[in-house]
Curated annotation (Swiss-Prot):
Cofactor(s) this protein requires: Mg(2+)
Binding residues annotated for a protein, in chain numbering: Q155
Species assigned in the record: Mus musculus (Mouse)
Gene designation per UniProt: Ttll9
Protein name (record): Probable tubulin polyglutamylase TTLL9
Listed PROSITE patterns: TTL (PS51221)
């Protein structure tokens, strides 16, 4: 169970090793009323609790995390759905800072070729603090399109495109010296102080120090890959169970989100052309759910294979694997590692005409609200398999490379599809254990997995 640290509770009267085995019910808590609640309520042996401090598993929102995590004691078996400073990866400005820092580290330690593997995000500047650097870059490349994004908002809120320096100057003048209004709370970065503990000041401590809402100015990808003349991006799910060591799973299913209007650079003010967020697209006057604003990743992969051949598709998806791993490695040393925490990230990836993937952002709270029956089924399976990997029931051995729709892609090093030790000396025949957009026969895999685990438990030692 969890409890406030000042309650001086001693815990249960059995050893921690046996405590987990003896639990007959998993007590869960969540405030999210969407697909997640359906999955939790229908999971065998799980029961919902309302009281604070009486849960074994809490799928919380990030606001609860900021206010309560540091004051909550958790028993060995307790799990919670976010890392303390998840925003090092999921806030747009922190993500870019960490990726830039990691790229410099790789260049220094491994050379330019290895560092170039981090060149998967568009040139980005934090505003307003890097305004002068941005202006310098802007003047080097006049006429290109830029996109402004608030660092802590989602669902396309506050985003605009521009090509003239006057537009950004007007924006800067319009916000300079004003307190932000309607802005999400800015989480404090967790810094290591000389004593070795983390500085976890609340976001409210820093809010008044911010004269304006922070944005990033990012070079807009002007040559996106189009299907049916429409722009799209990909939503991919990555589950991180640990940062030290890094242990990450990639889900086989995901989807492509299409804009509702044919792509053109002649109307940069039209969000229905340039923003693929469902929250934006569903406000379009001619939006129809059955029109096809989402494709499952398996369909998308098959489409690309028919157009470009299997080899080009393998290269593209391998490049996306690189994005997932390098982005996680970029924050591995700054994320506060905690055995109670896991995180289901939603990656947003854009593909350009050259089949190069670009990382747009990473979401700590990817939408779990279904927009269609197909979307509901995907998210239900995703969440069921997330709970299988988290393994509150203690059924897994820890050696599994696949659980349902999740494939273990990194376990303190790359994971091979083949069984046995990995020979990474030349990487000649090494194939990463990822199957994004491939067949997801999760039900049959889970049936075989749990049957095998049950047989192992019954076998004489």
């Amino acid at each position: 169970m969890s409890r406030q640290k000042n309650q001086n509770s001693k815990g249960h009267g059995v050893s921690k090793g046996k405590e987990r085995e003896q639990r007959t019910l998993i007590r869960f808590k969540t405030t999210l009323m969407n697909t997640l609640m359906d999955v939790l309520r229908h999971r065998p042996g799980w029961v919902e609790v309302k009281d604070e401090g009486e849960w074994d598993f809490y799928w919380c929102d990030v606001s609860w995390l900021r206010e309560n995590f540091d004051h909550t004691y958790m028993d060995e078996h307790v799990r919670i759905s976010h890392f303390r400073n998840h925003y090092e990866l999921t806030r747009k400005n922190y993500m870019v800072k960490n990726l830039k820092r990691f790229r410099k580290y790789l260049e220094r330690e491994s050379g330019k070729t290895e560092a170039a593997k981090c060149d998967f995000f568009p040139k980005t500047f934090e505003m307003p603090c890097e305004y002068h650097l941005f202006v310098e870059e802007f003047r080097k490349n006049p006429g290109i399109t830029w996109i402004m994004k608030p660092v802590a908002r989602s669902q396309g809120k506050g985003i605009f495109l521009f090509r003239r320096l006057k537009d950004i100057m007007d924006w800067r003048k319009g916000t300079s010296g004003k307190k932000p209004t309607g802005v999400e709370t800015q989480p404090a970065r967790a810094n290591m102080n000389p004593s070795g503990s983390h500085d976890t000041r609340s976001s409210d401590d820093q809010k008044d120090d911010l004269p304006v809402e922070n944005y990033v100015a990012q070079r807009y990808v002007e040559n996106p890959y189009l299907i049916g003349g429409r722009k799209f991006d990909l939503r991919v799910y990555v589950l991180v169970m640990s940062y030290i060591p890094l242990r990450a799973w990639l889900y086989r299913d995901g989807f492509a989100r299409f804009s509702n209007t044919r792509f053109t650079l002649n109307s940069i003010d039209d969000h229905y052309v340039h923003l693929t967020n469902v929250a934006v697209q569903k406000t379009s006057p001619d939006y129809h759910l059955k029109k096809g604003c989402k494709w499952m990743l398996q369909r998308f992969r098959q489409y690309l294979a028919s157009k470009h051949g299997p080899k080009a598709v393998e290269t593209l998806f391998s490049d996306m694997d690189n994005i997932f791993i390098k982005s996680l490695q970029s924050v591995q040393k700054v994320i506060i590692s905690d055995k109670h925490c896991f995180e289901l990230y939603g990656y947003d990836i854009l593909i350009d005409q050259d089949l190069k993937p670009w990382l747009l952002e990473v979401n700590a709270s990817p939408s779990l609200t279904a927009s269609s029956q197909e979307d509901y089924e995907l998210k239900t399976c995703l969440l069921e398999d997330t709970l299988h990997v988290v393994d509150m029931e203690a059924r897994l051995t820890g050696k599994e490379k696949r659980v349902g729709g999740f494939d273990l892609m990194w376990n303190d090093g790359p994971v091979s599809r083949e069984d046995g030790p990995s020979d990474l000396s030349g990487m000649g025949n090494f194939v990463t254990n990822t199957h994004l957009g491939c067949v997801n026969d999760r039900k049959e895999q889970l049936r075989q997995l749990f049957r095998s685990l049950q047989a192992q438990r019954k076998a004489p030692s």
